[in-house]
A protein has these predicted regions:
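Extracellular/lumen-exposed scaffold segments
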Residues: 1-156
């Protein structure tokens, strides 16, 4: 068991739909991939009365003009004992697509984010993680994670 799994998170990472940035590209789709341990949930951008939404801050990045999240449709979870404590979010996995706008068209990018998210099971906790991805300039090919991103994009 990884240390993060003690807090309900199996992994948090940045993934990309493409292996590289095309020389004509002004943007690329990347995603924050959050895999949760069984029975844990995380929150949507508007999590309900008591939740903590996933938030990120761009740090130490190169060729990054802007990052815009595209939230997949969430689900409402109702607490059977305390129905007023319902939450809006995701279970098992959240792949949050991000539109990465480049400062310089067709140049590689290094993206580093500080991510914070609330997770709940019988108790709730805040998890913080620094994640990064390097995207070189080149001939882009689909990554093995491209399908995960496409599935989430279809739910936006």
């Amino acid at each position: 068991m990884q240390a993060d799994e003690l807090y309900g998170v199996r992994k948090i990472r940045l993934i990309s739909e493409k292996t590289a940035i095309d020389i004509n590209s002004k943007s690329i789709i990347i995603a924050i991939d959050v895999e949760l341990a069984p029975n844990w949930k995380t929150y949507w951008r508007s999590p309900g009365q008591f939740g903590l939404p996933l938030e990120f801050r761009i740090i130490e990045s190169t060729n990054v003009l802007n990052i815009t999240p595209l939230w997949p449709a969430p689900r409402r979870f109702v607490n059977e004992k305390f129905p007023f404590l319902s939450m809006i979010g995701y279970e098992k996995r959240l792949v949050l697509p991000l539109i990465l706008e480049l400062t310089q068209k067709g140049r590689g990018a290094k993206v580093k984010l500080d991510v914070s998210l609330g997770i709940c099971r019988n108790m709730c906790a805040s998890v913080d993680k620094r994640i990064e991805i390097n995207l070189p300039t080149g001939s882009p090919k689909a990554t093995k994670e491209a399908k995960l991103i496409a599935i989430s994009m279809a739910r936006v």
